[in-house]
Amino acid sequence: MRKLLLAGSILALAVPAHADANGDLVTLVNDVWAASLKEQPVYASALGVNEHASELSDYTLAAQDRRAADAAKFLTRLNAIPSDSLNAASKVEAGILRRALNSTIEGNSFGQRAINFTTYSSWHQQLAGMAQNLPFRTKADFESYNARLAQYARVNDENIAVANVAIKGKYTQPCVTLKGFEGTISGLITTDVNKSRFYEPYAKKRPAGVSEADFAGLAKAAEATIRTVIHPALNKQLAWYTASYKPACATAPGVSAQPGGAKYYAFRVREETTTSLTAEQIHQIGLNEVARIRAEMVEVASQAGYPSREAFIQHLRTDPQYYAKTPEELMEKVARVTKIIDGKMPSLFGRLPRLPYGIKEIPAETAEGTTTAYYNQGSPEIGISGTYFVNTSKLNQRPFWEIPALSVHEGVPGHHHQIALQQELPLSDFRKYGAFFTAFTEGWGLYSERLGIEMGLYDTPAKDMGRLSYEMWRACRLVVDTGIHAKGWSKQQAIDFMTDNSALSAANIEAEVNRYISWPGQALAYKLGELKIRELRTMATKELGPKFNLAAFHDAVLGQGSVPLDVLEQQIKDWVAAEKAKG
């Protein structure tokens, strides 16, 4: 079991006396984190905190109000701590905490808080995948899981009630993104309960710590719950979605068309980028990056012997040699590339994480409508590895030449390396497990794709075009996301822009544009974060000259976990100064 850093009441909201400002901050941070775990009991279990091991979250709007009210009380406590009495590390901690609390408070002020699902992430999908993050070693582990399954109907009703508020307030997802969403619900209703995703813990080998009789009894109880609680709830959700939600879907793709949408989008831009850049500024940065990358793509096409970028891309999109015939073949290719990457890591990093990662296929019921791949973090506390999920649907649109760039982003040195390393850092639990800034995390993932050049991964024009296509993909996001949500672009305009500029397949572009429409602002973080890391590397190289060490720079970037970009900039400036001082 994981212990929190300091003991204390979960909701100790009263303002403390100031005998020691740094100590007060530690107490506050741990109180905030304990409150967060109470609100996220499944995540708490994944971290080995078992006080709420049989619970699921409260999904009501009243719960959102409660979290915002608690954040305001915590913010009052933070404001009462004299910042000039904090040491340098505590000032960073306080700044990150302040940002998180303000985000909770401000986010709850928008009507868009009732938007509780996207086309690729909803409560039914999250709970169907819940088991992959939980420990299953003891009888108590399985009992807790069964208790959670029994709460499915309550969670379903709460989420439907919130979504009904979204319908009433005209905060629904756009119609153009909802194609096939019914299948993500109906796909979880299985004729054979033993093949249900909710039954997965019992489809695996019985752990030694559970008797055969207990395991059989618990499995039978889970079967009954899936049949009598979960399947009826899924049928209820499917009927509600078809009759109530889908007919009320939004006709405009941009969030700015919703009530208060322009203000909400500005909030989302600040949240995801951790900058003060406006949508217009970001749009222009995107156009500039698209032009630069396009020129590089022309050069690679010429090296490959093609008269134009478009001709080479057409070859890459249509030649059968670049595509797997079976899911197994695709997964084998991914596994081979990741093994090569693993061997290159020691030359680029001084510190490597201990937690391993594995590769799995994206579940079939969500694969058709979701992105190419994603990463699911592991847990050192309960011994669960990180997972790089690969989409094996629509094989004729999953080219081999994308695999190197995709793998360095999702696995190592990208998400797995960064997140698993963060879990080992001597930071507060709040920082290690609760503070994830998209601009840093995804910026690092995209920067890692560029590290593939130094690893020698892009050893053919096809693979290099794959890298450039992925970089172009993220540059296009700056243009497309702001175009849709700030400039009134249609979905087709967004698709046409990405088709004209990237080498992505039609299926990928469709899924990606749906994602940008459904999740305003999130896609902006990747390219802006990567540009900042590259800018800091250039600065450090210039300042340190022959003393610059790339592995040490990478360790410095990752050394304080996920941080806002302004904090990262100061962090690297401090590292450069310290390196200079070594003489």
Outline where the language-model segments fall:
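Gram-negative bacterial Sec-dependent N-terminal signal peptides
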Residues: 1-19
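N-terminal maturation segment of proteins
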Residues: 19-583
